[in-house]
Regions:
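Basic/aromatic-rich interaction segments and small domains that mediate binding to polyanionic partners
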Residues: 1-95, 100-168, 172-176
């Protein structure tokens, strides 16, 4: 049985979050035929679809637990279909949150350029937002200056105030 928009709009947020974390579908419920009474529809299929869209605006990252809550907070009020708008939301958040400079290491295979996985760098500032690579930061390795995607960096000091925001951005970038 699929829930209608009336039920979905009245569904407690914690139930939706728990369902997302556990990978369950909160929009339906399986019942035996004898547990259901035939009734008249209270809405249309379109209204139900619209209710689900509204729920996703506040719960689309709930499946990630606490990390998802932080990501959702950054994206509150943002049309997630507009990729540049979401990148700009991250840029605003990171500009306010990060303390520059900070030390990081390069992650993953780097097929081009002078930086390699494991290189230690000093991140100086956010340079720009790119529609393909996301947040680009200015960094230094030794005396050389480079621009590099933030999604390919990890803050070295786990206790740094920069660690969690950069990790949250990386997780969002990988799952967008």
């Amino acid at each position: 049985m699929q829930w209608d928009s009336v039920t979905l709009k009245n569904m407690p947020g914690y139930f939706i979050e728990q369902s997302e974390v556990e990978g369950l579908d909160y929009t339906t419920m399986c019942l035996w035929a004898e547990e259901v009474e035939l009734s008249e529809p209270r809405d249309t299929k379109g209204e139900t679809e619209e209710a689900v869209k509204e729920i996703l605006k506040t719960h689309s990252w709930s499946w990630l637990g606490e990390e998802g809550k932080r990501i959702q907070k950054v994206l509150t009020g943002v049309d997630e279909e507009d990729e540049m708008e979401t990148f700009r939301a991250w840029e605003r958040y990171l500009e306010k949150t990060l303390a520059f400079p900070f030390d990081a290491k390069v992650l993953g295979y780097q097929d081009k350029g002078p930086l390699r996985s494991g290189d230690k760098v000093s991140v100086k500032k956010i340079s720009l937002v790119d529609d393909h690579y996301g947040i680009i930061v200015e960094l230094r390795r030794g005396r050389k200056k480079y621009d590099h995607p933030l999604c390919d960096l990890e803050v070295i000091n786990n206790d740094s105030i920069n660690y969690q925001p950069v990790k949250d951005y990386r997780v969002w970038f990988a799952n967008r």
